[in-house]
Regions:
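Short acidic-glycine loop/turn motifs at beta-strand connectors
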Residues: 7-8, 13-17, 142-147, 204-207, ...
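A short local loop/turn or secondary-structure capping micro-motif enriched for an aromatic residue
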Residues: 20-30, 157-161, 218-221
Length: 279
């Protein structure tokens, strides 16, 4: 099942049919068994598919209500190595090696819902940063009880130059206007997402590809319920929350984003999250 939040309402897509759901987003998705809950709406009259296609193509919003977005870091070996490389001159590389092997994961706050960009929107790079990358990440929707209910694609925009200068600058490297995008929908399977699921990214500059890559979830060191458990250990989220789970796709050190770049993040079952870097 795919659940879209659009300008004209909530649209559920399953088995080639689309259904309108008249409900607030928060109450709709914060369910103890979201897949079963959504299945109840498939007994209604399906939407005209051309109208549903138009609503999704022209009016898709970020699949978030009032939830917070959090993020996990250094969950893939590639990410650990990249963080160590960018911070070696400041002496911070030790911390990334240590957190990769530690029981406790790196978790940090990413964005409030009003700062989240949807597919088709613009993400930003900081004016005081010299080295910037997108981070394509499977993102979990976790209900208020701490159970993973759905998945979406996320882009954790990051300043490698600022974080590399000093690990304590991570909030500035990660949290700013236009630094977080989610979409295009919530993927709600009836079972946990497969560890063989592939995450892909392509970046185009003036129509030419400048970076592409893909990785499977089974390359992640941490388990998804493990990350959710740590986040909920001493935190409560009344309407649930979103958790980005880290990236294993890191461009080479010679690469940095530029205004006008088009970033496309694709995850099997979810679709494509596409954003343009703002001028």
């Amino acid at each position: 099942m795919q659940l879209f939040k659009t300008k004209t309402g909530n649209i559920l897509r399953t088995e080639g049919k689309s259904f309108h759901i008249d409900s607030s987003w928060d109450s709709l998705i914060n369910q103890p068994d979201l897949h079963q809950h959504l299945s109840g709406f498939t007994k209604g009259t399906p939407l005209n598919e051309s109208e549903a296609d138009l609503a999704i193509a022209n009016g898709t919003l970020p699949p978030i209500g009032t939830q917070e977005v959090w993020a996990a870091g250094v969950t893939y070996l590639k990410s650990r190595d990249a963080r160590m490389e960018e911070s070696k001159d400041s002496g911070g590389d030790f911390f990334y090696r240590k957190v990769y092997d530690a029981d406790r994961p790196e978790l940090f706050f990413k964005a409030l819902s009003h700062r989240v960009v949807g597919t088709g929107g613009q993400v930003r790079i900081r004016k005081d940063s010299k080295w910037d990358v997108p981070e394509p990440e499977l993102t979990l929707f976790i209900d208020s009880k701490g159970s993973i209910q759905a998945y979406t694609a996320g882009n954790d925009m990051s300043s490698r130059s600022i974080e590399g200068e000093n690990p304590l600058y991570l909030p500035q490297a990660k949290m700013y206007e236009g630094s977080c995008s989610l979409g295009p929908c919530l993927f709600v399977p009836g079972h946990p997402i497969s560890t063989e699921t592939k995450i892909s990214i392509t970046i185009h500059r003036k129509t030419k590809p400048v970076f592409d890559g893909n990785i499977q979830l089974n390359r992640m060191k941490r388990q998804l319920p493990e990350l959710a458990g740590w986040l909920f250990k001493e935190m409560k989220f009344e309407n649930g929350c979103f958790l980005m789970t880290g990236t294993g796709l890191v461009p080479g050190n010679e690469f940095t984003l530029q205004p006008g770049d088009v970033i496309a993040i694709s995850i099997e079952g979810i679709g494509v999250l596409r954003n343009v870097v703002a001028s």
